[in-house]
């Protein structure tokens, strides 16, 4: 097992693992992970997020689909760290989402904690459960499936 103190990834390392960039990079830091098992990361939600201009004026709430995307990105990091695959050659595609539940709104100033646990891995498919928390309270949850594919096949 990896010592959690050794498993912290900062934004520079995350940029080397995910193809996402502003404004769609939704993971700021990884605080713990165990390859093939789980990951804990977070996204600092600020009023400067472009989506708050229209969602919703006067009552800014993070869109649920972006909470799911943040969970999927954390899950993507877990997949990368669970394989020997060269990241530059691969894409991780969100292929399915089940049992989505939004429990609590996410507002500017919140620290969105992203927890993903690997459920199953078969060939190119990875299935995991994701949960997003704010202040220790469940904000959203889902079961997600992703496929790993070669960039050249796209």
Curated annotation (Swiss-Prot):
Localization annotation: Cytoplasm
InterPro entries associated with the record: FabA_FabZ (IPR013114), FabZ (IPR010084), HotDog_dom_sf (IPR029069)
Residues at the active site: 55
Pfam families according to UniProt: FabA
GO molecular function, one term: (3R)-hydroxyacyl-[acyl-carrier-protein] dehydratase activity
Assigned EC number: 4.2.1.59
Keywords associated with the record: Cytoplasm, Lipid A biosynthesis, Lipid biosynthesis, Lipid metabolism, Lyase
Principal location: cytoplasm
Record's catalysed reaction(s): a (3R)-hydroxyacyl-[ACP] = a (2E)-enoyl-[ACP] + H2O
GO biological process: fatty acid biosynthetic process; lipid A biosynthetic process
Ribonucleoprotein listed as a keyword: no
Entry annotated with the keyword DNA repair: no
PANTHER family: 3-HYDROXYACYL-[ACYL-CARRIER-PROTEIN] DEHYDRATASE
Free-text function comment from the UniProt entry: Involved in unsaturated fatty acids biosynthesis. Catalyzes the dehydration of short chain beta-hydroxyacyl-ACPs and long chain saturated and unsaturated beta-hydroxyacyl-ACPs.
HAMAP family registered for this protein in UniProt: FabZ
NCBIfam families: fabZ, PRK00006.1
Protein name (Swiss-Prot/TrEMBL): 3-hydroxyacyl-[acyl-carrier-protein] dehydratase FabZ
Taxonomic path: Bacteria, Pseudomonadati, Thermodesulfobacteriota, Desulfovibrionia, Desulfovibrionales
Gene: fabZ
């Amino acid at each position: 097992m990896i010592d959690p103190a050794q498993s912290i990834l900062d934004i520079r390392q995350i940029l080397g693992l995910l193809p996402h960039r502003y404004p769609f990079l939704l993971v700021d830091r990884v605080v713990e992970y165990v390859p093939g098992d789980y990951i804990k990361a977070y996204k600092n939600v600020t009023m400067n997020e472009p989506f708050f201009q229209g969602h919703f004026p006067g009552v800014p709430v993070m869109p649920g689909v972006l909470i799911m995307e943040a969970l999927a990105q954390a899950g993507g990091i877990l997949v990368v760290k669970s394989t020997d695959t060269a990241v530059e050659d691969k894409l991780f595609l969100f292929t399915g989402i089940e049992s989505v539940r939004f429990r609590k709104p996410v507002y500017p100033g919140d620290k969105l904690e992203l927890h993903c646990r690997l459920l199953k891995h078969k060939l190119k498919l990875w299935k995991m459960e994701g949960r997003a928390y704010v202040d220790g309270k469940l904000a959203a949850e889902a079961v997600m499936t992703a496929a790993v594919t070669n960039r050249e096949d796209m």
